[in-house]
Amino acid sequence: MEQYLELCRHVLEHGTERSDRTGTGTISVFGYQMRFDLQEGFPVVTTKKLHLRSIIHELLWFLKGETNIAYLQENGVRIWNEWADENGELGPVYGKQWRSWEGANGKTVDQISQVVEAIKHQPDSRRLIVSAWNAAEIEDMALAPCHCLFQFYVQDGKLSCQLYQRSADIFLGVPFNIASYALLTKMIAQVCDLEEGEFVHTFGDAHIYLNHIEQVKLQLTREPRPLPEMRLNPEVRSLFDFTFDDFELVGYDPHPHIKGEVSV
């Protein structure tokens, strides 16, 4: 995961200090891109241990179209707790927008189902896009979408995905986002009878919170280890049939976990 470490170095060297919504403060750059060849291994950070269970369950939760954290809590995932109300609700966040985007005419659109069908039947389309940024509903969301738009591209029997992330917490959030969208790409590739291609990660405001700088510097002292392999149950033929037990990460040998506080 040299690409991730290079991002960290770039922001430490070229970032400027900025205030932010949370009051923590950041060093930030605007505009950056990383590319990962998914056939070279599963892009999960090895310079600290990630909680893969949280990544997988969060993605499955998005795909269910849910916006209440009950499913996450039942599966030991706490990453959304700080933003939920007393009933566990988050408002019309990612799952709602992915699976039931509501238009001005009251019609709902299942963007995920639409994009999977388009990949299968119109692979050359330039409209293979899913957006979580519904401007009419931003104010009702507990947290505006950080990873807000992604597009697929089919070439030579391979499926690639590019994510645009408007706001990127480099220490805590970005490693999760890389793994999540790489996994989504693999899942969709499987159900569309394609091989996986590239994951392209494009950032708007890429930042390191001031209370994460020492943790990032610690990661930069650690040597990256070989990427693991993510195995999917080949029997699953529908994107919405995947369960947690259908995933196996083989050969993940990370450095120890590094703790960092979440800025809410």
From Swiss-Prot:
Disulfide bonds: none annotated. Keywords: Cytoplasm, Methyltransferase, Nucleotide biosynthesis, Transferase. The active site is at C146 (nucleophile). Its EC number is 2.1.1.45. Pfam families: Thymidylat_synt. It catalyses: dUMP + (6R)-5,10-methylene-5,6,7,8-tetrahydrofolate = 7,8-dihydrofolate + dTMP. Pathway: Pyrimidine metabolism; dTTP biosynthesis. Its main location: cytoplasm. It comes from the Bacteria. GO terms for cellular component: cytosol. (6R)-5,10-methylene-5,6,7,8-tetrahydrofolate binds at H51, D169, S263. Signal peptide: none annotated. One of its GO terms (biological process) is methylation. It is found in: Cytoplasm. DUMP binds at R21, R126, R127, R166, S167, A168, D169, N177, H207, I208, Y209. HAMAP family: Thymidy_synth_bact. Catalyzes the reductive methylation of 2'-deoxyuridine-5'-monophosphate (dUMP) to 2'-deoxythymidine-5'-monophosphate (dTMP) while utilizing 5,10-methylenetetrahydrofolate (mTHF) as the methyl donor and reductant in the reaction, yielding dihydrofolate (DHF) as a by-product. This enzymatic reaction provides an intracellular de novo source of dTMP, an essential precursor for DNA biosynthesis. Belongs to the thymidylate synthase family. Bacterial-type ThyA subfamily. This is Thymidylate synthase. It comes from Halalkalibacterium halodurans (strain ATCC BAA-125 / DSM 18197 / FERM 7344 / JCM 9153 / C-125). The gene is thyA.
